């Protein structure tokens, strides 16, 4: 274990331990090189550092994740070894794993479950494109950021399609609750194995639990390739059949029945909540024969309740005691056949006479009493026709919100279906006005007109949809930039909550930035992107020995100025250029050494352009070796590349002694 507060690998200050896996520990750390950015550091535990298989598996994860750059995959920032310890650093996701999220937020709405699964599929599409099978997909290996973004992690047992397994039992690595049937049989994991695991994860999101469980790994594994998948709709009636069909196909036991790619599953998932799939039949597979698929017809509630219970009881009794065809209780001696026929005929005739007499007596005294038909789920027109056919009158129509019954269809009658009423009784209809609530989607980046139409379709009144415009140079006019209610919010139509959409409009003004010190090419490009006409961007060059050539030294107008692009004015940028001429300093009275050094190092004159001559005459007070003349003179302009500088040094004549 790494000590808290220690600086690991020369850059990571360990804050705390946040995880402990089968082979590695995970720490929250601050990256000192990246200004204290929080990262997760995963370190292979000491007892595995000398295990070549463990090290290979750890390095496999590092390589696999480093090769996958995707917004829905945890990003690797560093891989290395410190004091013999294998480690990798990755982005820190400050949220929950999907397992815990399901536990704390179940039930998840259909929309949220589809959104999360869609993000997981996009991540795995990249992995599969790169030839990588995860092989350990489970909710614990999917992290959710505070804004609900899903990120896949822990590619610790991922394997490339073409690579050889690490060990003979390698194909059985992974969590058995999400293990595909082919893996449970010991076959090699494939892309379709990951798809199966995602199907089980999706099942868990919509039901709150895993489909197969048991006392041992063997028991659970057997269920994966022997037991049919329990019905999602049986546990969560809000799930439409099209959505359950996605899970059924993803978890098909035969590979030929399962999705062949995550792209195929993603396309099917994307339309699973659409209106045109609302009446989809349940998808089933024959997992034992060559037949690929069958379709079960939809069964209505009335069909279910009409199945004779006596038959079920009889069958149950015959199965329970099949050897006893006739019991002592059921046995009766039988009369001769001729007498039996005569007796039955007389009894039947008497019964018919009695029934006829009773009917005549009842009908002559009371109006007919009829059971009200069940019209739930029918349109208003269909329900009225059904009731009129049964000799009922139509009463009042009332509307009521319903999460299950489609708008415009009957929820129930008043009095209720099956109730006995006289002919001509007025039957009231309770009609669905649609869902009382819905999940707010992510509208950012979409056209505001499309979003408004969608909200109106969901019965949000016009006066509750507020549009606020905001100038934008980055987004197309009419695009939604912000929304007041975040994605995933449950919107209750009865509470009349306002929805504010901030929509981009073409910018007419911009704020000029501080361009001093920046490269002129970048600034010109930025101004052009903000619709400043190129002919109004004026560049003035000025020699500078202090600034890099091309660097902006002055600007007009200044930083912070509001600039109207609809009425553009000139912007002047003063840009540094390399110094080519300077004013000649005065070196009269200086030494030769000082003068040359200053000309070369400070002024920038090349040594080859400096000429030194000696003169024997000089002003009074001159000292030998002193500069007494210079050309050019002090203050004159000197071209650093062309001008030759002449320096005259005083050297007095030597006089010889008289003999």
Swiss-Prot record:
Membrane topology category: Single-pass membrane protein
Phenotypic consequence of gene deletion: According to PubMed:22211696, cells lacking this gene show round shape (the cell shape of wild-type strain is ovoid) and form long chains with unsplit cross-wall joining cells. Their septa either are not positioned at the equator, or display an aberrant ultrastructure (curly aspects). They display delocalized sites of peptidoglycan synthesis. According to PubMed:22431591, cells in which StkP is depleted clearly show an elongated phenotype, with cell-wall synthesis occurring along the peripheral side between the septal zones. Reduces transcription of the peptidoglycan hydrolase pcsB gene.
Catalytic activity from the UniProt record: L-seryl-[protein] + ATP = O-phospho-L-seryl-[protein] + ADP + H(+); L-threonyl-[protein] + ATP = O-phospho-L-threonyl-[protein] + ADP + H(+)
Gene3D superfamilies in the cross-refs: 3.30.10.20, Phosphorylase Kinase, domain 1 (3.30.200.20), Transferase(Phosphotransferase) domain 1 (1.10.510.10)
Cytoplasmic side: 1-342
PTM description: Autophosphorylation occurs predominantly at the threonine residue and weakly at the serine residue. Dephosphorylated by PhpP.
Gene Ontology, cellular component aspect: plasma membrane
Signal peptide: none
Record-linked SMART domains: PASTA, S_TKc
Keywords assigned: ATP-binding, Cell cycle, Cell division, Cell membrane, Cell shape, Kinase, Membrane, Nucleotide-binding, Phosphoprotein, Repeat, Septation, Serine/threonine-protein kinase, Transferase, Transmembrane, Transmembrane helix
CDD domains: PASTA_pknB, STKc_PknB_like
Effect of residue 42 to M: Cells form very elongated and unchained cells. They have a giant length size and show the aberrant presence of multiple septa that do not seem functional. StkP is properly recruited to each non-constricted septum site
Transmembrane segments: 343-363
GO molecular function: ATP binding; protein kinase binding; protein serine kinase activity; protein serine/threonine kinase activity
SUPFAM superfamilies reported in the protein's UniProt record: Protein kinase-like (PK-like) (SSF56112)
Similarity section: Belongs to the protein kinase superfamily. Ser/Thr protein kinase family.
Annotated domain remarks: Consists of an N-terminal kinase domain, a transmembrane domain, and a C-terminal domain containing four repeats of the PASTA signature sequence (Penicillin-binding protein and Ser/Thr protein kinase associated domain). The PASTA domain binds to peptidoglycan (PGN) subunits (shown in strain Rx / Cp1015), is essential for StkP activation and substrate phosphorylation, and is required for cellular targeting to midcell.
PANTHER family according to UniProt: MITOGEN-ACTIVATED PROTEIN KINASE KINASE KINASE 20-RELATED, SERINE_THREONINE-PROTEIN KINASE YBDM-RELATED
Protein name, UniProt field: Serine/threonine-protein kinase StkP
């Amino acid at each position: 274990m790494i000590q808290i507060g220690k600086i690991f690998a020369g850059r990571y200050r360990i804050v705390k331990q946040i995880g402990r896996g089968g082979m590695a520990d995970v720490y929250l750390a601050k990256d000192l090189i990246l200004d204290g950015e929080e990262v997760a550091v995963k370190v292979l535990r000491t007892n595995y550092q000398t295990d070549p298989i463990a090290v290979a598996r750890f390095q496999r994860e590092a390589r696999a994740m480093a090769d996958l750059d995707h917004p829905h995959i945890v990003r690797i920032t560093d891989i290395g070894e410190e004091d013999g310890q294998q480690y990798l650093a990755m982005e820190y996701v400050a949220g929950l794993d999907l397992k815990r999220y399901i536990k704390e937020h179940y039930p998840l709405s259909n929309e949220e479950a589809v959104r999360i699964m869609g993000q997981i599929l996009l991540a795995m599409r990249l992995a599969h494109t790169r030839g990588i099978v995860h092989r350990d997909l489970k909710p614990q290996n999917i992290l959710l950021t505070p804004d609900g973004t899903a990120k896949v992690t822990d590619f610790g047992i991922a394997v490339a399609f073409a690579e050889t397994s690490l060990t003979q039992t390698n194909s059985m690595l992974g969590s058995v609750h999400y293990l595909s049937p082919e893996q449970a049989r010991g076959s090699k994991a494939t892309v379709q194995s990951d798809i199966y695991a995602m199907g089980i994860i999706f099942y868990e999101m919509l039901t709150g639990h895993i489909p197969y469980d048991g006392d041992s790994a063997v028991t659970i594994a057997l269920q994966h390739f022997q037991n049919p998948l329990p019905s999602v709709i049986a546990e969560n009636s809000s799930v439409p059949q099209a959505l359950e069909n996605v899970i059924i196909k993803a978890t098909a036991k035969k590979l030929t029945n399962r999705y062949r790619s995550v792209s195929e599953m993603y396309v099917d998932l994307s339309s699973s909540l659409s209106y045109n799939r609302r009446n989809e039949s349940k998808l089933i597979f024959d997992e034992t024969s060559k037949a690929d698929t069958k379709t079960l017809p939809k069964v209505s509630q009335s069909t279910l309740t009409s199945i004779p219970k006596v038959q079920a009881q009889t069958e149950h009794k015959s199965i329970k005691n099949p050897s006893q065809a006739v019991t002592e209780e059921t046995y009766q001696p039988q009369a001769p056949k001729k007498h039996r026929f005569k007796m039955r005929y007389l009894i039947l005739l008497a019964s018919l006479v009695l029934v006829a007499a009773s009917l005549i007596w009842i009908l002559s005294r009371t109006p007919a009493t009829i059971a009200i038909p069940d019209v739930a789920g029918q349109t208003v027109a269909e329900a009225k026709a059904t009731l009129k056919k049964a000799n009922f009158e139509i009463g009042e129509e009332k509307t009521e919100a319903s999460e299950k019954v489609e708008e415009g269809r009957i929820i129930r009658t008043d009095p209720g279906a099956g109730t006995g009423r006289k002919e001509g009784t007025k039957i009231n209809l309770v009609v669905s006005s649609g869902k009382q609530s819905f999940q707010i989607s992510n509208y950012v980046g979409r056209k505001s007109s499309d979003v408004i139409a969608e909200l109106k379709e969901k019965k949000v009144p016009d006066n509750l949809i507020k549009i606020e415009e905001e100038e934008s140079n980055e987004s197309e006019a009419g695009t939604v930039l912000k929304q007041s209610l975040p994605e995933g919010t449950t919107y209750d139509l009865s509470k009349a909550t306002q929805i504010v959409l901030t929509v981009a409009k073409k910018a007419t003004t911009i704020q000029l930035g501080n361009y001093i010190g920046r490269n002129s090419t970048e600034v010109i490009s930025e101004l052009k992107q903000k619709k400043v006409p190129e002919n109004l961007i004026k560049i003035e060059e000025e020699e500078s020995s202090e600034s890099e050539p091309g660097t902006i030294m002055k600007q007009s107008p200044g930083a912070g100025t509001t600039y109207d692009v609809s009425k553009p004015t000139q912007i002047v940028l003063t840009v540094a250029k390399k110094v080519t001429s300077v004013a000649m300093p005065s070196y009269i009275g200086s030494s030769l050494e000082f003068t040359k050094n200053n000309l070369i190092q400070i002024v920038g004159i090349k040594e080859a352009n400096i000429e030194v001559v000696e003169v024997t005459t000089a002003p009074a007070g001159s000292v030998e070796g002193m500069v007494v003349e210079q050309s050019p003179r002090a203050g004159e302009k000197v071209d650093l590349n062309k001008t030759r500088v002449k320096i005259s040094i005083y050297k007095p004549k030597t006089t010889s002694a008289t003999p």
